[in-house]
Amino acid sequence: HFEENKLLHRREMRLADFVDRVLAGGETNDYYLTANNEVLSRPEFDLLLQDIGTLPALCDRAQLSARSSLWFGPAGTVTPLHHDTLMLFHTQVVGRKRWRFISPLETPRVYNYYDVYSPVDIDRPDLHRYPEFGQVKVLDVVVEPGETVFLPLGWWHQVSSLDLSMS
């Protein structure tokens, strides 16, 4: 899982080179520009941030670049089942993503391990190893360009890019 070992996989490269790689490649989970990349703090992205319309009252526009992440990658990228330690809004700009949500009330059946992760693969759950997961209710949503997901604190989720995707 990339997320668990992200520092081992992290590479620095020019954004233009990364975009070229994504556009030239096919469906893969081998490369993905993910959260906490600080790319939106760069002046080159000011116009993109200015294009964001009205924000909910709880969001501080002055903090937008510092508290936002740009996600970009090909179809086939998967963020494995985990929960976040903060609430977030995730806006789909290009392409579609499939989100699978699980209530935090189901945490004992999700087999939480390694801080915020689950060893269960929603696509191929090993019910012999994780039998309680068979009782978990999974909400399945496809998010289209222009749509925003609100993720409450502690909700488990696994996210898959169905298309080349920017969020």
Kindly give the residue locations of the regions a language model identified.
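N-terminal accessory scaffold of Fe(II)-dependent oxygenases
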Residues: H1-T148, W156-S167
